[in-house]
Amino acid sequence: MFYALLLSAAALAQQAPAPTDQPTIVVTGQRLQDYRDALARCLARHCPPNEDADATLALAEALFLNGDYHEGRDAVAASLRRNRNQARAYPEPVSDLYRAHTRLSRHLGQDIDARRSAYGILSALQEGIPQEDYRHFTARLELSEYLMLGGNYNGARRELNDLIRIARAAGREDVATLAELRMLWFQNIAQPESDARAQLLRMTRETAPAQRMRSTGAKLLLARIYRREGRAADADALLAEIGRSSAASGAHRRLISAPNYVLQVQDPNDINDNNGESIPTANVLSRMSDNFEDKWIDVGFWITPDGHVSDLEIVRDSNENGWADPLLESIRGRVYSAAAEPTYRLERYTYTAPYERVTGTNIPRRSRRARVEYLDLTQNEPPPVPPAAASSSHRE
């Protein structure tokens, strides 16, 4: 389902590499039509909201993979019009529709709609499931991320504070810890002069078994900060403390650092990082108008056991990928957490820009603040053959 792809807070299990061909994610016209027909049959028999949502999300996922963002977003929006009033009886299907609409809107530069739908993810759950649980916690984490991506640090902090309070009341100290770490990461981005780094440093020194998650998370975040500052030795020392206990084959590979990149002219007012776990989004200020329609690439690469990127290639793209050269160079320079085996990643990147209204007219136009939107596609496809052992030291 499309909503599984959109769950940025989830840790996705990697399958062991198997000797297969390069992944193929082309969605044929006939297959797309099959999804359209399935939704049409569902609506013709007046299917219940949960079946409507399932058929819609399956179509939207296929359309997204094929680069048909507008049709996918329109399909989800139509399902929301049919079902948004059914959240009390069908909270999860309606919430999933809002989640898909949020992601598609972000990739199309429809940031105002994306923000509204991000709130809808949580509100639909609250309407049908008053007692908050893991579903609400995930929605609150997502909402905080979208608020931060939009530069609304105070809103993101407010949502995370609410999550900490609610999670602790529910006995979920692990969720509260995750929210605390994310808030410190946001604080370090928005207010570098704050004591966020000092708090992270104190967390790294906690040795009680019950505080292992807090200590490990703080070390990972500090390692990212140190690498950004050119303190590679300090970052490596922190990672060595963590050890390889959680780096078994198939474990989630955490991004430790990535070189900054600029597509044209960097906008110094934009925040170009999010929650410390997903891939940074670079915002740029274009001095010339640009065409942001149908510009996306699917990038495949291996992460070697020592955490470096190998055998990177563009697996598929739309009609032009010249904009992506700085992005690809940044991906090649990434450092991930270590693991016992190489792991494969497949990622979608979309070149887009938000719409804005110009003084004196109600006609929205593209902003000159371009950006790249990201979505992990790894769980959808089997990996190709892993690189030879020599590739660990040779970065493509």
List PLM regions with ranges.
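Charge-biased low-complexity segments
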Residues: 15-396
